[in-house]
């Protein structure tokens, strides 16, 4: 399914939040600054529906994002996991590996929307995580294996694994003024791949938020058996005072060789308020 998910990401990038010379909507009224801190909660539920391999995983994370430095072209941010819980019907041993990230500071470079680019000091992060693995009770052979697996990951995959929620937030945090309305990427087929996507933008009545939604569908008819299909729906509320999302929900449904439903919800806690006019 890797190739199909790459097509999903391509479809998302193809339907960019549109610009317009007139009637544009603000997306960020105050610039990012060093010292900014925001608290988020992330809730994920994944159900694998393949016969004979059914499973369910539920996790909840609470984390803080601090701006360490801000420039027009990008940010330096710090991610700190504050609390975590996880249940997995097929692998109950995953929760300690997640909980070991609690308290580990992860500084990273990001683009202007907050999308992670690279970790600033992976060796320090690795060593802090190793100490936490010992603190949560993993024996030495298990620690060696977990750290070895992390060490051999490509840098981009490691960033995605640790900071996946940040990428979801950044997907819905445009840094250019946008135009209200509905915008479609027409259905198109290239070889075995067929895809379509839709984006809509509308202002909130209070003047402090924007509602953004993205829907896309990608089908791969190549190979034997049924076609692989991915459908993804994302809805979010952007707090235009600071340009960061107050809530994002993404539902991804796959069918074909892999059958699953994943729902991810990330929201700020406490929710940002609208300044009195």
Pin down the residues of each PLM region.
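Hydrophobic helical h-region of N-terminal Sec-dependent signal peptides
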Residues: 4-10
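Acidic, serine/threonine-rich low-complexity disordered tracts
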Residues: 17-110, 168-277
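C-terminal segment of classical bacterial N-terminal signal peptides
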Residues: 12-15
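Solvent-exposed helix/loop surface patches that form functional interfaces
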Residues: 113-213
């Amino acid at each position: 399914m890797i190739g199909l998910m790459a097509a999903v990401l391509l479809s998302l990038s193809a339907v960019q939040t549109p610009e317009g010379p007139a009637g544009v909507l603000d997306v960020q009224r105050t610039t990012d600054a060093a010292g900014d801190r925001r608290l988020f909660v992330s809730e994920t539920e994944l159900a694998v529906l393949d016969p004979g391999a059914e499973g369910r995983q539920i996790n909840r994370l609470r984390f803080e994002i601090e701006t360490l430095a801000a420039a027009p072209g990008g940010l330096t941010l710090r991610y700190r996991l504050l609390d975590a819980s996880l249940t997995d019907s097929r692998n109950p041993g995953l929760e300690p590996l997640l909980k070991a990230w609690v308290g580990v500071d992860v500084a990273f470079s990001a683009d202007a929307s907050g999308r992670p680019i690279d970790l600033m000091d992976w060796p320090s992060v690795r060593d802090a995580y190793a100490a936490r693995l010992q603190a949560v009770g993993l024996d030495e052979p298990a620690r060696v294996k977990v750290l070895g697996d992390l060490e051999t990951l490509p840098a981009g995959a490691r960033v995605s694994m640790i900071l996946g929620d940040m990428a979801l937030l950044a997907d819905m945090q445009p840094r250019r003024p946008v135009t209200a309305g509905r915008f479609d990427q027409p259905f198109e087929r290239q070889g075995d791949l067929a895809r379509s996507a839709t984006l809509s933008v509308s202002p909130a009545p209070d003047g402090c938020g924007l509602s953004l939604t993205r829907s896309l569908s990608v089908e791969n008819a190549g190979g034997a058996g049924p076609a692989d299909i991915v459908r993804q729906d994302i809805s979010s509320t952007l707090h235009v005072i600071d340009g960061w999302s107050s809530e994002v929900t993404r539902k991804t449904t796959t069918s074909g060789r892999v059958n699953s439903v994943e729902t991810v919800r990330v929201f700020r806690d406490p929710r940002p308020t609208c300044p009195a006019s």
